[in-house]
Amino acid sequence: MYKRQIPLLIGSAFIIVLLYGVQSWVPTFLHRIHGWEHTRIGDQYGLVALFAGSLGVVSGPVIEKYLTKLNVNAATIVVCIVTAIALTIIGPITFLSLSSSTVLIGIFITSFFITLPLALFATSLQNITPNQYRGVVSGLYVFTVNITGYGLGPMVVAFFTDKVFKNEMAIDLSMATIFLICGPISFLIFYFGRKPFAKALVMKSS
């Protein structure tokens, strides 16, 4: 029964890793790579995180509903697929290529796409799950988010910086690397999970 929920559970985990990785390490990235003072980081990145994150969370359901009205099959997964593609491209560009004067633009766009599907994960899992199993699936989702988000998110950036690149100034490479890993993996999971998700919606509605 749970095979239809697995793509959302696992795919969302990789997006959550990016979310907490960015939130934990962007201030350090701006300080080490671009030489920003902590007060500037707090003022400017704080505003970017607030507005980009809020805009992404609000926009996700709006876009999903619009795609549904256009009869797009499994619109929720389509939003997730677009998110994965965008993050795979925009993330590395932001952390490797942008100058100090334009990096916040890249971080804004990245933060927007990271938060775009967040509101859809939990509600979509509920939509395709029979009533008697919703509590179990919700528990699995919360467990997955906590383990991957709070655990792996901040840790994986530190691992690449300290153990792989072995240079604290390589945090830009570490940030780009997690996007190049998590982005394509989440894309593949969502892409191949779209059909089972669509079938689950049909079964639930019938």
Say what each PLM segment does.
Residues 73-121:
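C-terminal transmembrane helical hairpin of 12-TM major facilitator-type secondary transporters
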Residues 37, 73-78, 159-183:
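A membrane-interface helix-boundary motif in multi-pass transporters
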Residues 9, 42-43, 135-140, 176:
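Conserved glycine-rich helix-kink/hinge and helix-boundary motifs of the Major Facilitator Superfamily
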Residues 56-72, 161-162:
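Helix-to-loop junctions at the C-terminal end of transmembrane segments
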Residues 88-97, 175-206:
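Multi-pass alpha-helical transporter architecture, strongest
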Residues 4-57, 114-122, 149-157:
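Extracytoplasmic gate region of multi-pass secondary transporters
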Residues 12, 16, 107-111, 142, ...:
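Helical-face signature of the major facilitator-like transporter fold
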Residues 53-57, 130-165:
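A late C-terminal transmembrane helix in Major Facilitator Superfamily
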